[in-house]
């Protein structure tokens, strides 16, 4: 059991709260980073599977799906790992038991898990460098690849929109059930961020500019807006 004192400082974090959670046989420890206000929740238990996640509050302000595109884009190379797709390399070469990134209606989450200590720390390092030092602020091509771009296959064919997220959301919006669910959500929450499609509406995705893309990254992807577990 960890021997920690409430209100004491540990590596720049202030220890704020301790609670036993019998249902998951864990002791939870809550910390707050003194300089940035970042929250950290640590689960103390005997589970051999180690899990790490960093999340950011990302309430959408339109239907462009900027946070969904950012979720994809931060994993397209970073300062320390300048590969085209480090996420794909981790999927192929790490010992992870879970590796993903998810965009919700009001937050974006980057979770990893592994039973191997060295692999676990490497996964954390790659993800932390990805969210705090991504190449997307320098490479407009990342937005074009993951978000949207124009594509012309021949002079006889019309110009089309393409992009990883754009194509993904076209598939989502091809479902009548999804369209109905979106209409219900807009009706239920007309004056909140939940009225917007956080994943991106294919009609609105091409409205996202590179300048706004970078501004939203800088505004929301910072330690003071993060929650770490």
PLM regions and their residue ranges:
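Charge-rich, well-structured scaffold segments of protease-associated domains
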Residues: 1-10, 59, 73-82, 86-229
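N- or domain-start disorder-to-order transition segments that initiate the globular core
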Residues: 2-47
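Short, conserved catalytic-motif segment at the N-terminal edge
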Residues: 48-52
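Active-site recognition of the HExxH zinc-binding catalytic motif
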Residues: 64-76
């Amino acid at each position: 059991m960890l021997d920690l004192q409430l209100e004491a400082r540990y590596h720049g974090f202030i220890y704020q709260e301790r609670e036993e959670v019998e249902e998951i046989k864990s002791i939870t420890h809550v910390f707050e980073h003194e300089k940035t206000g970042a929250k950290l929740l640590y689960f103390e238990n005997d589970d051999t599977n180690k899990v790490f996640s960093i999340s950011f509050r990302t309430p959408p302000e339109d239907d462009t799906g900027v946070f969904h595109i950012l979720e994809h884009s931060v994993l397209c190379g970073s300062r320390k790992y300048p590969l085209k797709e480090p996420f794909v390399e981790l999927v192929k070469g790490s010992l992870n038991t879970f590796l993903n990134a998810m965009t919700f209606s009001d937050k974006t989450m980057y979770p990893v898990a592994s039973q191997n200590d060295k692999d676990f720390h490497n996964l954390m390092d790659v993800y932390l460098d990805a969210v705090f030092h991504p190449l997307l602020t320098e490479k407009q091509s990342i937005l074009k690849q993951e978000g949207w771009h124009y594509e012309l296959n021949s002079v006889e064919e019309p110009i089309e929109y393409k992009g990883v997220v754009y194509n993904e959301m076209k598939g989502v919006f091809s479902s009548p059930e999804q369209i109905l669910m979106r209409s219900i959500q807009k009706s239920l929450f007309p004056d909140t961020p939940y009225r917007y499609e956080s994943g991106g509406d294919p009609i609105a995705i091409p409205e996202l500019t590179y300048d706004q893309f970078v501004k939203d990254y800088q505004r929301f992807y910072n330690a003071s807006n993060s929650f770490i577990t």
